[in-house]
Every structure is written in C-alpha cells, then in structure tokens.
A protein has these predicted regions:
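Catalytic cores of RNA-modifying enzymes
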Residues: 1-222, 226, 245, 265-268
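C-terminal lobe and adjacent flexible extensions of AdoMet/dcAdoMet transferase-like proteins
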Residues: 220-270
Length: 270
C-alpha cells in the first residue's frame, strides 16, 4: 500500500513538483523504512494519529495499514492536490496548515499520537510547542536530524544535554528508538536522522506549586548561556546571597551536570 521509490519520483514528475529547500523537504521513499516508523510509533487499530508534514503520503499510507484513524497535516499547498488524491480514498482527511500556528482544537478529538518527519529548522520549536500547548498529544514519534534527536533525549552529563533537553523532560520522557540513513530520502540529505519517541507525563515533572515554570526555565536558560562555566560564574547576576547553600547545589558544578530537579531547587531557593 505504501509508495515505492519509483512511484514517488513519478508522482513528483507527474505534478511538476520538486522538494522545497525553503521548507526543508526530504521525502522518505523506502517502503521498509516507513513501515518501520509506523511499527515504532506503536499505534494500533482505532488509535488517533496525526501525521505532521505528510509530504506525498508514503508514511501516511504505512500508518493507515495499522488500522489507526489517521489525519494528515501539510503546509505546502503545492502538495495538497496529489496528497488528497492518494489519501482521501483510504479515509485520511488532509488539513492545509502550518503546524506551529494551526488550530489543533479543530483537529484533535481525544488522546492522539503525532508521527512526523521534521526538517531541521522546525523540529525543536514545533516539538516544544506541542508539548507546551497540546495536552491531547500524549505521544510523539518524530524523525529529526540525529543531533537534534540526541538533544531531545539527553540527560545530565551527556554531551548533547542542554536547555532543550530539560524542557522536553519537564513535559515527557524521550528516547532515541532508531536511526535512519540518508539513502532512503529524496533528495538525499547530508546528515543521518534519528527516530525519537516522546511520551507525555501525566503531570509536569516539577510541581508548579514548588516552583513556577517561568522561574525554573529562567535559571536553566541563564545557566546554559555559559554552559562551560561554573554555576557561580554563569549565575552570578541571577543568584541571591546563599542560594547555592539553600538549594544544596555545589556552585563549582557546571550546568550540563545538573538534573531538572536540581535546577528546580535553585529556582525555589532564590
């Protein structure tokens, strides 16, 4: 049911389409890869699935094979005609929308899994936007540039660990569940991709009654503004007298060594 590489290339040629550099488009053209992504998404018959950036529908068709109820979103108006021609006969509704500003209340009707192949320039802001604003999205499987995926899933002490990792941890649990090479895309990217699963927590990881989100991430952002420096240097303008002692955090440590809970203690102790 999924597109073959030849069928996708023919579809592009038939409609006079070329992948948009401005939109960071790289279409997956390998049937085994899209079925693998659908399998890793964990969706089964009857589940609600939103695919963001449906492209030409190859991954969408693999998701349909699971028996899930699939809705597709695509920002590129040039793809809408061929995409709807492929998907509407198999019961998939296609929404023309920018995922960063879309009205999700018109799309989400219950707990939903998002599956998406995301371009580099959109991946981080979009994933954070969905975590922060769309509680009905309970799970995501996103394909992103490998470095971005490692950042999403990093923990204290990891090289990729930073403010983005902590923001993801605040809302959910992330892990890299697979890698995808460049040969399965048209056009072929210069980088490897990672498949990242993010499962939303039932409640945010730090109790807002203990420390507010804005206060917490102010200290996170300030610390990682000078990530290689000790906390006493990176936070010297932010920190009040005795804050490190009250928080039980050694001021000679570096931000990349601290857990989310330790940042929360700092924010609460200020």
């Amino acid at each position: 049911m999924t597109h073959s590489r030849a069928a996708l290339v023919a579809l592009l040629e038939e409609h006079g389409l070329t992948p948009s550099r401005a939109l960071g488009q790289n279409f997956v053209v390998d049937a085994n890869t899209v079925r693998r992504i659908a399998r890793l998404s964990g969706v089964t018959a009857g589940d609600e699935v939103l695919e963001i950036g449906a492209g030409l529908g190859s991954l969408t068709l693999a998701l349909v094979e699971t028996g899930a109820h699939v809705t597709a979103m695509e920002v590129d108006r040039h793809l809408l005609g061929p995409l709807r021609a492929v998907l509407e006969p198999v019961g998939v509704s296609v929404h023309h929308a920018d995922a960063l500003v879309a009205d999700y209340s018109a799309i989400l009707t219950g707990p939903t899994t998002v599956v998406a192949n995301l371009p580099y320039n959109v991946a981080t802001p979009l994933v954070l936007h969905l975590l922060e604003t769309q509680p009905l999205i309970t799970r995501m499987l996103v394909m992103v540039q490998r470095e971005v995926g490692e950042r999403f899933a990093a923990h204290a002490g990891d090289e990729a660990y930073g403010a983005v990792s902590l923001r993801v941890q605040y809302y959910g649990d992330a892990r890299v569940v697979g890698k995808v090479g460049p040969n399965v895309f048209v056009p072929r990217p210069k980088v490897e991709s990672a498949l990242v699963e993010i499962v939303r927590r039932a409640r945010v990881r730090v109790d807002p009654a203990v420390v507010g989100e804005e206060e917490l991430f102010t200290v996170v952002r300030t610390s990682f503004g000078q990530r290689r420096k000790m906390l006493r240097r990176s936070l010297h303008e932010w920190a009040s007298e005795g804050v490190f002692e009250r928080a039980g955090v050694d001021e000679t440590r570096r931000p990349e060594e601290l857990t989310l809970e330790e940042f929360a203690r700092l924010a609460a102790a200020r």
